[in-house]
């Protein structure tokens, strides 16, 4: 008997708090093995660098192995979330339940993958 597959589209709500939580996990351990510096572009839009993206700002992420600097924006970040969900990265962590995120289940590894997908559309480190 043959198996058949259908493509399902869904809309997932991502709050500013979700973004801040994921960025905090990324900057406080998730990306530190490949990124040695996160630099706020312009003025701080929140109290911490982790709050920059949710407020429409930009972070420059400095590669610790290459002489490269990558710019992370809200648009790129949301694309990273989309790719992580579409490709079922860490789906067993239940960080995306139905139509919203559960950032209590986003650890440093999940945050790292989201940031890499945001910047490179692929996971190239780790």
Stretches with model-predicted labels:
Residues 73-75, 79-84, 90-98:
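Acidic, low-complexity, intrinsically disordered interaction modules
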Residues 31-35, 89-96, 122-123:
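Residue-level signal for secondary-structure boundary elements
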Residues 60-61, 68, 80, 84:
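Eukaryotic, polar/proline-rich low-complexity intrinsically disordered regions
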Residues 99-125:
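Acidic, proline/glycine-rich low-complexity IDRs
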């Amino acid at each position: 008997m043959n198996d058949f597959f259908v493509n399902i589209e869904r809309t997932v709500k991502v709050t500013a708090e979700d973004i801040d939580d994921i960025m905090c996990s990324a900057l406080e351990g998730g990306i530190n093995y490949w990124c040695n510096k996160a630099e706020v572009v312009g003025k701080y839009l929140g109290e911490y660098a982790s709050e920059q993206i949710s407020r429409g700002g930009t972070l420059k992420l400095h590669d610790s192995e290459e002489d490269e600097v990558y710019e992370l924006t809200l648009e790129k970040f949301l694309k990273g979330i989309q790719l992580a969900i579409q490709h079922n990265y860490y789906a067993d962590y239940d960080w995306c339940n139905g139509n919203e995120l559960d950032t209590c289940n986003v650890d440093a590894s999940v945050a790292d993958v989201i940031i890499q997908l945001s910047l490179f559309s692929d996971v190239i480190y780790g």
